[in-house]
């Protein structure tokens, strides 16, 4: 079958290492009754492995040439549905299933963060997620409070999910090799986070505002939102830096604004 060209505008790096592919499938541990959604399947390297383990697989691919390639490759498969769609705009609840979705994929580096935020907005229909991401992004998602990597993505990802850094993947596992290392992460939605954010848009705004001034104290960084008299009510020291606040702290700040 004719090979498809890589398109830089889609951030395409195709995974080809069979050992890494098997390791990813083992981490996902798909079951026959699962409904899996693969974002950015490319030429179907991971798809081939998933098809043998799962009876209901949906592929979301933006590249029209790759969609045609995949339709031809899997035209005899009854357990696969291909959506030509931008994952950043895709309604994941539109996938026909009576079970929560298990979302997987080798996410394009150039859209990984906005795509994660899009998925968080649809977390109600997702059971878990396993992604290949730039290693730096995985470190930010799983960063601990007070660390250099802890920031906006850390707070929002940790509000919505329990996140586990699984393993690192070398650039040599891809064609063409990216300039940076990649890593596999598991994200499991949290449905009982305490305290609950009353307004998720407000929470996102507070976190974004705070980390726009991460070198300032949180009292100064959020002075447009929080007046000095409110900090004692929150039981948060306004002299702390934004990266020293926990997810719970940010939720409390957000909730006092509602």
UniProtKB/Swiss-Prot annotation:
Keywords: Cytoplasm, Methyltransferase, RNA-binding, rRNA processing, S-adenosyl-L-methionine, Transferase. It comes from the Bacteria. Belongs to the class I-like SAM-binding methyltransferase superfamily. rRNA adenine N(6)-methyltransferase family. RsmA subfamily. GO terms for cellular component: cytosol. GO terms for molecular function: 16S rRNA (adenine(1518)-N(6)/adenine(1519)-N(6))-dimethyltransferase activity; RNA binding. The lineage of its organism: Bacteria, Pseudomonadati, Pseudomonadota, Gammaproteobacteria, Legionellales. It catalyses: adenosine(1518)/adenosine(1519) in 16S rRNA + 4 S-adenosyl-L-methionine = N(6)-dimethyladenosine(1518)/N(6)-dimethyladenosine(1519) in 16S rRNA + 4 S-adenosyl-L-homocysteine + 4 H(+). This is Ribosomal RNA small subunit methyltransferase A. Transmembrane segments: none annotated. It comes from Coxiella burnetii (strain Dugway 5J108-111). Specifically dimethylates two adjacent adenosines (A1518 and A1519) in the loop of a conserved hairpin near the 3'-end of 16S rRNA in the 30S particle. May play a critical role in biogenesis of 30S subunits. Its EC number is 2.1.1.182. InterPro entries: KsgA/Erm (IPR001737), rRNA_Ade_diMease-like_C (IPR023165), rRNA_Ade_Mease_Trfase_CS (IPR020596), rRNA_Ade_methylase_Trfase_N (IPR020598), rRNA_adenine_dimethylase (IPR011530), SAM-dependent_MTases_sf (IPR029063). It is found in: Cytoplasm. S-adenosyl-L-methionine binds at residues 13, 15, 40, 61, 86, 106.
